[in-house]
A protein has these predicted regions:
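Extracytoplasmic gate region of multi-pass secondary transporters
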Residues: 7-49
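Residue-level signature of mid-helix packing/kink "hotspots" within the transmembrane helices
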Residues: 52-60, 147-148
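Multi-pass alpha-helical transporter architecture, strongest
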Residues: 169-196
């Protein structure tokens, strides 16, 4: 019955796609920064720490701005688009040095946490109370599949086209996630009454 709910189905499909996009790039971010940007191990470690800090900021932004229907719709679009944009900007950022990488990582980290908590929030909003735990478990399982799928896609792209193409591939997949949200998820959220 969960997959018959258009909102939940769109969330599950969208989760698979955006998690794949995210981890297509993130799984290879260290060798990417080493090979493309020539960053040292210390610089990469510092950059990844900023990634984590940005995730915490994303949680605070969610708590502050994820209220009201229109804000929720825009928040979802913006967080997904931010992940895709960050992946698309990784090549010029890596070539531009550590400052550019940090800026992109802030965007990526904030938006990565933002879409995750937003999707979990909508699952709880639209899943029947008796099935909320199952819906959340399905979401977690799909997200984990996306992690594995992203790693596999990144590896295949790196082998076929070189490390420099990995984040571009992630950006294209991320753009598909934005399209799913705009064409299917948000219209379904507008049509479907949340569970009280």
């Amino acid at each position: 019955s969960l997959v018959k709910n258009p909102v939940l189905l769109s969330l599950f499909v969208g989760t698979a796609v955006i998690a794949t996009a995210y981890y297509t790039g993130y799984s290879y971010v260290e060798p990417y920064l080493q090979q493309i940007g020539g960053l040292s191990d210390e610089a990469i470690t510092t950059s990844l720490m900023m990634f984590g800090v940005a995730g915490v900021i994303g949680s605070f932004l969610f708590a502050r701005f994820y209220v009201g229907k229109r804000r929720r719709y825009w928040y979802i679009r913006a967080s997904l688009a931010g992940v895709a944009l960050a992946l698309a900007l990784m090549m010029p950022a890596a070539l531009g040095g550590m400052g550019s990488v940090l800026a992109v990582f802030v965007l990526w980290g904030i938006c990565g946490v933002s879409f995750n908590v937003a999707y979990q929030s909508e699952i709880l909003r639209f899943a029947p109370p008796h099935a909320a735990a199952v819906a959340t478990a399905i979401y977690s399982g799909i997200f984990n599949l996306g992690i594995g799928g992203g790693s596999a896609v990144g590896g295949a792209v790196s082998t076929a086209f070189g490390m420099g193409s990995v984040c571009f591939a992630g950006a294209l997949i991320g753009a598909a996630a934005v399209a799913i949200a705009c064409v299917f998820l948000i219209p379904a959220m507008r049509r479907t009454r949340p569970v009280e």
